[in-house]
Amino acid sequence: GTAPLFTEVGTVKDLVIDASCSFVPTASEFGIIAIRNKGELTNVTNKANITMSADAFDDAVICGALVAEGLADITDCHNTGNITVTAQTSMKGAAVAGIAGYLKATMKDCSNEGTISASCAFVNGASTIVDVKNCAPSVGGLVAYGGNDENGQFAVKNCVNKGKVSLVNTSIDSVTENVKRQDVGGIAGASNGDITNCHNYGEVYAKLASSNGSAMSGNEAIVLAGGITGGDYFAVGQIKSNITGCTNEGPINVFSDASKSNSAVGGIVGWPGKEAKQSTCTKDCVNKGDITISGTVKVRAGGVQGGTGNMDNCTNEGEIIFESGDKASVIGSLCGFHSQGNTIETCKAFGKVTAMATVDGIGGLIGNIGNAAHNTGNGCVVDCVISGGAEATRGLVIGKFNGKTKNITLGETSPIKVSGSVEGTKIDAGNFANFVHGTTNYTEGVHVINAVFGK
């Protein structure tokens, strides 16, 4: 087929679209059931593949297996079909996902097992996705873009993704202006509200390559990637999503040749929100997926968060592998970058953190901490194997301090327990203090890390 069953639809329940069907849409907005649902969808399953292609997409692309625009609740709905959107040259804003391209309602008890992918040579400007302005391509296992206003609020609960989620640009050096941030996430590409008790098992893959393999530093081409969500860049106020009780077990592989500005990659969330004191929190989340960074990208990568945000009782067990990239990149078992007084409490940083090329900071808890006042880190545990990086910007708790002037205290009420190894040296009670933090910008009395040996 080439068109949805309906343009707009009310309540639909107990429906299966069989795998013998296939859809090749001719319009840039598509969902098998409808362009938009204004009534609830319940117990609807799609098994059919959707393939959308063009030489170039000049208009916004919104494609979900069931609906393009989810404007009412979606419950117990499932997709096993592959969703493929391809532009031979360029595309602008795009929302590609396993259930709904855009969601301004509650989605719960839903799943995706299909491969979800969007690819183009380069991004040629931005588009409006329903009511979200200046959008870039976003790909999500279940949802690509979220909406949030007085008419409806994005929320995703008890959902699972098992399919590969893929975002590819093959010629980013063809862009002529800064590109808004592209998102890719196992559950949601660009969230705009709470995500609760969701689980990702599929690979999250992003490739933003230049045509000749060289670093592109003239224009921005940023990617935000996370096992659960890319993050809140397009959310209301750029800070809307609490992520609670979620797990990622899928590998996250990011290749990029964009080196002008920081991309952000996290096992749970890439970019938690704007770089300020935040009101949202990533809580009770676990990452078990390995994260691999390559290309010439400038990146902040961490097992739970790539960029800065609040974290409570989160754990990373996956390996962070920096194969190659820009020397200004930072990586950490828990988070790549942390700043603005956001809090990290009762979190656990396990796994391996490996830099196979030069980085600006490598840490167990935090790769790089900003020059902003902090009092946090209470009850945290670090048991990492750290390899690579320079001694001056490497540490079990903090790799690099960005400045010398702001008071930073970690583990004041409950010291941080540290163990593991650094550059092949096993940490013990006699030597742990030598490996707690890097020396760059460290200022005694201003920077205080209360740590003890132990697990």
Identify the role of each PLM range:
Residues 2-455:
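Surface-exposed loop/turn motifs in large extracellular/passenger domains
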